Amino acid sequence: MTYQKANLPKPRKQPYAWVTWLAQLLAGEKNCTYAIQQQIHHQFERKSRDYDASEHDEKVIKRAAKLQAEGFTVYVENANSFKVQGKKFNICVAGRPDIVAVKNDWVVVEDIKTGKPKSSHEMQVKLYMLLLPLAPETQQTCQDKVPHGRIIYSGEIVEIPAWKIDRNFKRRLRDLIAILCTSKTFKPCPSVSECRYCRIPSQHCSQRKI
């Protein structure tokens, strides 16, 4: 068998999840656990999307400049890439927040959003807040403590204090990862809105709506 055929998924050596996938499930914005579970265990071809990142990139640059003017040491995008290996579950969780800013003992993680506010945005930043101090790549930057979180929208800034990374949030994440790492395969939960952007091709999901 070869994995060069179009749309044929390649099994991952280890379950692998992006923070954004987990955030959507935690926020209840994605109902098809099957799709996320398949992506965690297999590599699928990326679907091309008509997304113009120029507005987002410009806002990141401007925000970073503002923080630097306020005396922060600012780390942007690729400098913030991290991977956290699970201890209880065999999974690697990866992420890349837009900005991590440090001023003395004050550490802030920020994510820039150009669209409308979503519940998953808060979950995404909270996951960054939890995982950044645990990752080898960013542990030192975070000074071994949970950073303050911010979501930067065009018209407002949403503050997420460190105390929100509480026992309940950690339990919810732990329960979700336990579900995703189980050997049980979930049934697809198709909908036009989710299937439109889903990476799972119809060859591997007979219930795709589009």
Please place each PLM-identified region on the residue numbering.
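Secondary-structure transition/capping residues
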Residues: 75, 139-140, 184-187, 209
